[in-house]
């Protein structure tokens, strides 16, 4: 009888639920031991989105919280640390808030959302109203945390007040967990109330983390390491653990052995190489890790369809604004060359500023490099010194994000020059290969090229295919088909002009050796051999132009048969 496999935890960020309902769990419980062994009163973990931050925070809550279900940790690695479990498991009041849902058009609405989060967490401790250890004044203070119209001054003190009341009732200091601490700041910057939100978060944290004598320790998570002067002013007990740090490097994301175990369990080991190429490559500290969101989603697809192709799961969870801003800098020659090196799988050396404010993020190209590194669009392969890193694109998925944004920016620049666009399209329709070639070469000079290393020939051809489609997409009166079945195979691009009397067939090839003339002839021969014109002839198109176009870096050769 075939074994029933555990469910894959897509989007499950509640540790207790994951364990109770028998989802597959990649064991990261030794984070608990390392956190206790490497003591810091306030710990901030910064990692890119979708790398397991929230699940780890939920796991910490499940372990430390008073009267927690110890069965959650049965057969986990931390359960073998018997003395540690006896001393710490289920022994502390835990306050756990997540700020990831604070997204509002105005500061006032964002503040209301923060109040609702505090209200919700305070309601978990309503037994304090019956406590014999709390005075009437204490209970009135607690009631103020339940009010939906809580004053902003109370909100700023709320986590400290709740900590003090819990310690007074239980006789035990409190563990404070704050997940996605930087999301309200990101939204506030985007929507124009950044200074007000910065002040609120600074006051909240100063009360909760600096002047809180009831605090055992705190753990915060986020994507960005916000400047200490911005919201962590005077917080001398803060330990920041970023993607560059060796400590805790294996606990966010899947290691290579984690992925091999998953694939073996689900009988998908034959997909290891493609998963590694698409989703591996991040280096946190000294450990190479995969994006867990990608691995879990792709494995789930493969369980249904073993022929499923890798997709950009991670990139679809964000607008990829940092990459968009970065690509807009490509008009500067140095930046363009650096992006071309990255796309080619090479490394570049940059000084990284890990502490920024959101106001600084896009203020300079130097800061943009730091944002791309911190948020997972670039990773490091080593250091030159404390702040200077060798940077590279981690994997195929991230490379695709760059290529997509490059293409979007290219289309934008094409649309801004209607005269050049009209010249190209008229020449294409008239069979003027010299002008088509000249126009294409001018376009190529203005965009980023695909260099030889790392990239397969098919992918290079796809890139240049995309460039041509990007140009042709603005010719609204033409019917443009891409990879349309015709004759004995598929033509790269098939066009019917507005009068439907002229048809254009384009075959694209990449000249690996740089011999553009020979490769463009090969492209033309393929059109003839595979009878790509059959469909146009069937539709009554009599005037057919056949183009063989060869590309090599920033050059092309165009030949035509009329």
Question: Where do the PLM segments sit?
Answer:
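Structural signature of nuclease core domains in nucleic-acid processing machines
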Residues: 433-562
């Amino acid at each position: 009888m075939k074994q029933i496999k555990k469910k894959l935890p897509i989007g499950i960020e509640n540790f207790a639920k994951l364990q109770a309902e028998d989802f597959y769990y990649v064991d990261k419980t030794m984070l608990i031991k390392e956190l206790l062994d490497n003591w810091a009163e306030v710990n901030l973990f910064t990692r890119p989105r979708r790398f397991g931050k929230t699940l780890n925070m939920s796991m910490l809550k499940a372990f430390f919280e008073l009267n927690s279900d110890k069965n959650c940790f049965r057969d986990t690695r931390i359960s073998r640390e018997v003395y540690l479990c006896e001393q710490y498991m289920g022994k502390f009041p835990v306050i756990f808030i997540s700020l990831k849902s604070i997204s509002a058009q105005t500061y006032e609405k964002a503040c209301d959302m923060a109040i609702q989060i505090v209200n919700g967490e305070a309601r978990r401790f309503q037994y304090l109203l019956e406590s014999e250890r709390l005075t009437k004044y204490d209970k009135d203070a607690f009631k103020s945390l339940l009010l939906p119209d809580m004053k902003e001054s109370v909100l700023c003190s709320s986590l400290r007040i709740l900590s003090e009341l819990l310690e007074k009732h239980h006789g035990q200091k409190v563990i404070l967990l704050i997940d996605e601490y930087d999301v309200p700041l990101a939204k506030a910057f985007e929507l124009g109330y950044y200074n007000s939100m910065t002040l609120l978060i600074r006051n909240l944290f100063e009360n909760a983390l600096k002047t809180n004598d009831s605090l055992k320790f705190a753990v915060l998570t986020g994507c960005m390491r916000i400047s200490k002067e911005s919201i962590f002013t005077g917080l001398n007990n803060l330990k920041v653990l970023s993607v560059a740090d060796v400590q805790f490097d294996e606990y966010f994301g899947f290691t290579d052995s984690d992925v091999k175990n998953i694939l073996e369990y689900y009988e998908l080991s034959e997909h290891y190489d493609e998963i590694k190429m698409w989703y591996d490559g991040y280096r946190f500290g000294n450990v190479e890790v995969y994006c867990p969101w990608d691995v879990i989603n792709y494995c789930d697809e493969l369980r249904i369809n073993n022929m499923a192709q890798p997709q950009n799961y991670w990139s679809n969870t964000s607008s990829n604004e940092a990459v968009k801003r970065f690509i807009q800098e490509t008009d500067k020659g140095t930046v363009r060359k650096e992006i071309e090196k990255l796309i080619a799988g090479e490394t570049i050396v940059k000084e990284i500023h890990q502490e920024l404010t959101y106001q600084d993020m896009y203020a300079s190209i130097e800061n943009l490099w730091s944002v791309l590194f911190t948020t997972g669009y670039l990773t490091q392969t080593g250091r030159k010194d404390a702040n200077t890193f060798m940077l590279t694109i981690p994997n195929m998925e991230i490379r695709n994000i760059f290529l997509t944004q490059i293409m979007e920016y290219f289309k934008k620049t094409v649309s801004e020059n209607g005269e050049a666009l009209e010249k190209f399209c008229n020449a294409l329709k008239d069979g003027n290969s010299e002008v088509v070639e000249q126009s294409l070469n001018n376009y190529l000079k203005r965009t980023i090229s695909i260099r030889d290393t790392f990239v397969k020939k098919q992918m290079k051809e796809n890139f240049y295919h995309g460039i041509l489609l990007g140009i042709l997409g603005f010719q609204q009166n033409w019917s443009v088909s891409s990879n349309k079945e015709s004759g004995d195979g598929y033509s790269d691009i098939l066009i019917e002009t507005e009068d439907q009397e002229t048809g254009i067939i384009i075959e694209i090839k990449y000249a690996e050796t740089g011999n553009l003339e020979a490769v463009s002839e090969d492209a033309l021969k393929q059109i003839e051999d595979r009878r790509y014109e059959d469909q146009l002839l069937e539709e009554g198109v009599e005037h057919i132009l056949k183009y063989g176009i060869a590309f090599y870096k920033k050059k092309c050769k165009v030949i035509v048969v009329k």
